[in-house]
Amino acid sequence: MIELKNYTLNFGPQHPAAHGVLRLVLELEGETIVRADPHIGLLHRATEKLAETKPYIQSIGYMDRLDYVSMMCNEHAYVMAIEKLLGIEPPLRAKYIRTMFDEVTRILNHLLWLGATALDIGAMTVFLYCFREREDLFDCYEAVSGARMHATYYRPGGVARDLPDTMPQYKPSRWHSEREIEKKNHNRQGSLLDFLWDFTERFPHCVDEYETLLTDNRIWKQRTVDIGVVSPENALQWGFTGPMLRGSGIAWDLRKKQSYAAYDRVEFDIPVGKTGDCYDRYLVRVEELRQSNRIIRQCIEWLRKHPGPVKVDDYKVSPPRRVVMKHDMEALIHHFKLFTEGFCLPRGEVYSSVEAPKGEFGIYMVSDGANKPYRLKIRAPGFAHLSSFDDMVRGHMLADGVAILASQDIVFGEIDR
């Protein structure tokens, strides 16, 4: 009698659907997945250890590079941990700015997820549509920090600087006519808040376009409905958070349950799924795009009416303004010491978490009283989600494994750390 053996397939890390550097060792029976073994570590950069060798303020930039699609949300968890140990509270205007940019970041993340997932499954048009909107939001990042991705904008005690009164303008070149430049600059004549307000007025129509292409699309539903079903009980046991947990029907959102920044001052709804499949997770993220847009509009309205400080007035934690520094020797000394030695935190330990686009992103920090952390532990939401991949994918076809992996929204910067 012929002995039949299962086929072993290496999926990634070079595969375009591997979401970075994921290597999957799949055991197949025909085209049905019997077992999946994720191999991680190919993007390990020792971020936790690096942060333990530098003053607190110098590690903010490392946070951007963990989940490099949810930059400011990662920064938020880190600076909140420092603020808890210091016992300081940022000004209310800084809280609103953080809330607004957290939601800008959420839209950036979900747009990339939607475009990449559609591309993995075979719908290319959505990818181009999503990147059209992402460019406008990257312009907002650039306006406040000078960088389009790794902003390093949040600071212990607030944010680096107030919102700008002008937006960067496109300049004439030999590749673009004056008419094209004028069209590109028509909504950049005012402040950042004006530019963002214009975006929030256009964006719901853009989301409608995505849904027209996908939500009732027969092929899209065949590829996502009843694929990768996770029950509420299993979702909790695996440690799911964010859209993965809400897609299984559990309305858990740190912005509501353990409110931080200005989330207790804005109104929004928590979308939840019913069956816990890939389609439900898609619907949850699409509705989160609309809710984030709603939160941003509320923040803009408040920020327009309430000018004020954006960081604490304590030179031990927050650098003095450049104008003051150039006229006051003491302020210059504070500035020099802050960016060379940094500041020391009281002895203690703290856990700080935010509702990042992928789930609960947490920072566990232990201080021994020095100017750098004794221990820094990063809780990445994608790590728990990827752990469940074998359980989610068993019994599905090989092509469905791509859809399930895409629905988890995996980014290896935070998983490997």
Curated annotation (Swiss-Prot):
Keywords: Cell inner membrane, Cell membrane, Membrane, NAD, Quinone, Translocase, Transport, Ubiquinone. Pfam families: Complex1_49kDa. Its EC number is 7.1.1.-. It catalyses: a quinone + NADH + 5 H(+)(in) = a quinol + NAD(+) + 4 H(+)(out). One of its GO terms (molecular function) is quinone binding. It is a peripheral membrane protein. It is an enzyme of class 7 (translocase). GO terms for cellular component: plasma membrane. It is found in: Cell inner membrane. PANTHER family: NADH DEHYDROGENASE [UBIQUINONE] IRON-SULFUR PROTEIN 2, MITOCHONDRIAL, NADH-UBIQUINONE OXIDOREDUCTASE 49 KDA SUBUNIT. NCBIfam families: NuoD, PRK06075.1. NDH-1 is composed of 14 different subunits. Subunits NuoB, C, D, E, F, and G constitute the peripheral sector of the complex. This is NADH-quinone oxidoreductase subunit D. It comes from Legionella pneumophila subsp. pneumophila (strain Philadelphia 1 / ATCC 33152 / DSM 7513).
